[in-house]
């Protein structure tokens, strides 16, 4: 809501500065976004009267004028504006004046004619008004008056960002009421008396949807001069509120909306066939709107119609064929209360957003319509003339809102505010806000005023008391609470440690949406029904994810399309698994996932560029697993996964259970996602790896370590990791490490077999190992793998 400070002060004028005013209303919950001057910086500009206006003898487009600015002599001024004419009241920049941009007015000669000043346009004075030529002031503008004072240009516009619950402040009336409450100042509304009817013309009003329109007022005004000029004071008030002047009738309805908070509309009476009918639209009924667009109406849209056709979308937008035009003689003024539930969302469904719909869908004061009708009639007669008919009203009292009655407990107020405000102050604040207050045993019973739709529960009253009392007036008091030491579980592996490790290995953390495209998800996790959202952001984000892999693959595609071929990403997040036995039928499992694609390392002149493969990702994942309590107990077993390459996929195993998966993305999936090149992913259950070994101090052996390499021939289908793990178990305390360093298949190795070269590191903490000790340990290892896997030492 943008408004003029000077207009507000016509209603309520507390003894505070502009800065104090904006701070005050911000602290009261009406956040001020911006404060701007209504005009540029200038001085020396006066109201003038063009006494003479003649053609310049040497220039077709210039006029020579004599202008009265209230001084002893008339000023000779040369003007190039086409609308300059004798008798016009104008804004005159006299010699010595300074205009915006530090432009100084001096005596000059234009084509040989003296010019001692300048006749100004709006733009030349930094006033944001679209116009051609110089300003045309009202005939009663006082000659010689300082122009800044004449238009009250020592003013600012204040832009307030109103929350959806404060619809009562979408008007000068509402803002003045709020400022008056904050300052205990009287609010003076303009005097509006009932306009006496001079003709008896009426129109029938048939409200067929009383729940949507409990009150509808109509009044005929005949012989209206729509060619009249909107007074400059009204144009300025509209401009400072962000609304441009259109014609006097529209300007008046806009003015009443801004001043009173009641949207209104004016119809051309000659274009109405029969009477007014307020009804729901027929499905696909068509209406041409004021902007020339055609709307195909839905059956839940309330319309204002006559006996033959729809005239306007109620509370939203008028129709082109019933609006006021330059040929209009008689008008029908409309003033109604539309139920917010029947207006909310209608404008948006037709791609519209209007000042009227914004107010009606939040709630307009349902006691305001008669006063607003009289105010609009008063202004219309003053500006455009006309013969006024009586007001015709159609009302359904049963469908009008009922004032909310809300109980406020003393105990609840003190608990939420943390401060005891005296009873008398609480009552005074609520009454200043327009509420009727009754004292009860536990506190108070307050009846909300007709303009406050947002007062519905006890907390609303607490908020009102708190903000008017002033949150800054509530003393600071530190909460008193016992400090309990939280137990620190050293065995828990911090997520930050894993994040740091992956970042150190060249990964970047990604955060993708938990909402995914359901059909695409079926490619990654087929055969599992995901939770479908009843009200999704979009169709592409309508399912809860079953895996983090989908989001990471889409992120890879996003980066590849932006010339980022090397991608290394990881993500920690939840997956959502339907489970009838779980709370709310859904298991939320924390997962850790990663993806790599592109070159193995950054491009370098001294390094060969190679593409990542399965073992790059496996190495990174093993580094993560090494941090955990079972770092040596994890294994990788070949598996089949619908999203992964059939020959390059493995299940991550621990204690005989699969806790994750790693592998190269299936070529068909690469094609459907639009991936460019080989992409490797992993996903693992976080709860299965989030423990670590508690560090224990131990002596470091001072005796030498011994390495022995063995080559074992085993069946080709036996996993290398199983062989290495068997070596570790059989080696006992002397075996410090066992590492696979070569796999050979070919000449010298029987077909269907493979040779595994394993480095064994043996060491004792008590003594130097003898050759016999080493040989015995190696022999025990060979016998163990031979018995378990049929392995044999390679010759």
Curated annotation (Swiss-Prot):
Keywords from the UniProt entry: Aminoacyl-tRNA synthetase, ATP-binding, Cytoplasm, Ligase, Magnesium, Metal-binding, Nucleotide-binding, Protein biosynthesis, RNA-binding, tRNA-binding
EC annotation from Swiss-Prot or TrEMBL: 6.1.1.20
EC supergroup of this enzyme: ligase
Annotated binding of Mg(2+), by residue: 454, 460, 463-464
Sequence ranges assigned to domain B5 in this UniProt record: 401-476
Keyword hit for Lipid metabolism: no
Subcellular compartments: Cytoplasm
Name of one Pfam family that matches: FDX-ACB
Cofactor(s) the protein requires to work: Mg(2+)
Boundaries of every FDX-ACB domain copy: 701-794
GO molecular function: ATP binding; magnesium ion binding; phenylalanine-tRNA ligase activity; tRNA binding
Primary location group: cytoplasm
Record-annotated membrane-spanning stretches: none
The tRNA-binding domain, residue ranges: 39-148
UniProt GO cellular component terms: phenylalanine-tRNA ligase complex
SMART domains, sorted: B3_4 (SM00873), B5 (SM00874), FDX-ACB (SM00896)
Cofactor: record remark: Binds 2 magnesium ions per tetramer.
Taxonomic superkingdom: Bacteria
Family: Belongs to the phenylalanyl-tRNA synthetase beta subunit family. Type 1 subfamily.
Name the record gives this protein: Phenylalanine--tRNA ligase beta subunit
Organism name: Vibrio cholerae serotype O1 (strain ATCC 39315 / El Tor Inaba N16961)
């Amino acid at each position: 809501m943008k408004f003029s400070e000077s207009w507000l002060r016509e209603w309520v004028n507390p003894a505070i500065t502009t800065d104090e005013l904006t701070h005050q209303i911000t602290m009261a919950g009406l956040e001020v976004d911006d404060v701007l001057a209504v005009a540029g910086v200038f001085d020396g500009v006066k109201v003038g009267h063009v006494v003479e206006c003649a053609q310049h003898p040497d220039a077709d487009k210039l006029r020579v004028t004599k202008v009265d600015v209230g001084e002893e002599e008339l000023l000779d001024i040369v003007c190039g504006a086409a609308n300059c004419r004798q008798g016009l009241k104008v804004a005159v920049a006299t010699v010595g004046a300074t205009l915006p941009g530090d432009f100084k007015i001096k005596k000059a000669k234009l084509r040989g004619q003296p010019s001692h000043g300048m006749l100004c346009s709006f733009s030349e004075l930094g006033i944001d008004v679209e116009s051609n030529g110089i300003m045309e002031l009202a005939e009663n503008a006082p000659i010689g008056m300082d122009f800044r004072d004449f238009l009250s240009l020592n003013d600012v516009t204040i832009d307030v960002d109103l929350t959806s619950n404060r619809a009562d402040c979408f008007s000068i009336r509402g803002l003045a009421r709020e400022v008056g409450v904050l300052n205990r100042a009287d609010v003076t509304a303009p005097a509006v008396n009932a306009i006496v009817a001079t003709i008896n013309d009426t129109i029938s009003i048939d409200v067929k949807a009383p729940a949507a329109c409990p009150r509808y007022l109509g009044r005929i005004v005949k012989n209206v001069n729509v060619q009249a000029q909107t007074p400059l004071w009204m144009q300025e008030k509209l401009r400072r509120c962000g609304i441009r002047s259109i014609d006097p009738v529209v300007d008046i309805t806009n003015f009443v909306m801004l001043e009173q908070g009641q949207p209104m509309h004016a119809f051309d009476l000659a274009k109405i066939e029969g009477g007014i009918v307020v009804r729901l639209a027929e499905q696909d009924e068509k209406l041409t709107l004021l902007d020339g667009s055609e709307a195909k109406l839905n059956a839940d849209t309330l319309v204002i119609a006559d006996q033959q056709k729809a005239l306007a979308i109620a509370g939203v937008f008028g129709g082109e064929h019933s609006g006021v035009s330059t040929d209009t003689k008689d008008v029908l003024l409309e003033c109604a209360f539309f139920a917010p539930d029947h207006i909310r969302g209608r404008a948006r469904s037709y791609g519209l957003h209007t000042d009227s719909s914004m107010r009606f869908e939040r709630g307009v004061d349902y006691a305001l319509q008669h006063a607003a009708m009289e105010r609009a009639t008063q202004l219309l007669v003053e500006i455009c003339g006309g013969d006024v008919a009586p007001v015709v009203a159609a009302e359904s009292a049963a469908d009008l809102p009922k004032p909310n009655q809300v109980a406020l407990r003393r105990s609840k107020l003190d608990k939420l505010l943390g401060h005891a405000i005296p009873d008398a102050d609480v009552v005074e604040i609520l009454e200043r806000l327009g509420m009727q207050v009754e004292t009860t045993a536990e506190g108070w019973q307050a009846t909300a005023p007709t303009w406050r739709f947002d007062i519905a529960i006890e907390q609303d009253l607490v908020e009102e008391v708190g903000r008017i009392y002033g949150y800054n007036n509530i003393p600071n008091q530190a909460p008193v609470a016992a400090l309990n030491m939280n137990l620190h579980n050293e065995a828990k592996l911090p997520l930050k440690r894993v994040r740091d490790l992956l970042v150190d290995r060249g990964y970047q953390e990604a955060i993708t949406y938990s909402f995914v495209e359901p059909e695409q998800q079926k490619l990654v996790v087929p055969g599992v029904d995901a939770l479908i959202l009843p009200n999704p952001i979009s169709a592409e984000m309508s399912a809860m994810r079953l895996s983090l892999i989908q989001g990471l693959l889409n992120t890879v595609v996003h980066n590849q399309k932006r010339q980022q071929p090397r991608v290394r990403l990881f993500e920690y997040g939840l997956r959502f698994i339907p489970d009838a036995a779980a709370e709310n039928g859904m298991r939320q499992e924390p997962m850790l996932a990663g993806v790599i694609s592109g070159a193995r390392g950054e491009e370098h002149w001294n390094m060969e560029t190679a593409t990542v493969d399965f073992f790059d990702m496996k190495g990174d994942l093993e580094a993560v697993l090494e941090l955990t309590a079972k770092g040596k107990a994890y294994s990788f077993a070949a598996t089949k996964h619908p999203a992964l390459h059939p020959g390059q996929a493995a299940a991550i195993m621990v204690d005989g259970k699969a806790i994750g998966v790693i592998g190269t993305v299936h070529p068909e999936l690469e094609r459907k996602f639009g991936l460019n090149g080989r992409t490797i992913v992993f996903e693992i259950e976080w709860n299965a790896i989030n423990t670590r070994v508690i560090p224990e101090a131990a002596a470091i052996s001072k005796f030498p370590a011994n390495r022995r390499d063995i080559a074992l021939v085993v069946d080709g289908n036996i996993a290398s990791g199983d062989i290495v793990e068997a070596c570790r178990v059989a080696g006992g305390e002397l075996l410090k490490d066992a590492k696979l360093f070569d796999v050979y298949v070919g000449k010298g190795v029987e077909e269907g077999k493979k040779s595994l070269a394993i480095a064994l590191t043996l060491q004792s903490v008590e003594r130097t190992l003898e050759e016999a000790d080493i040989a015995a340990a190696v022999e025990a290892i060979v016998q163990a793998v031979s018995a378990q896997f049929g392995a044999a030492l390679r010759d």
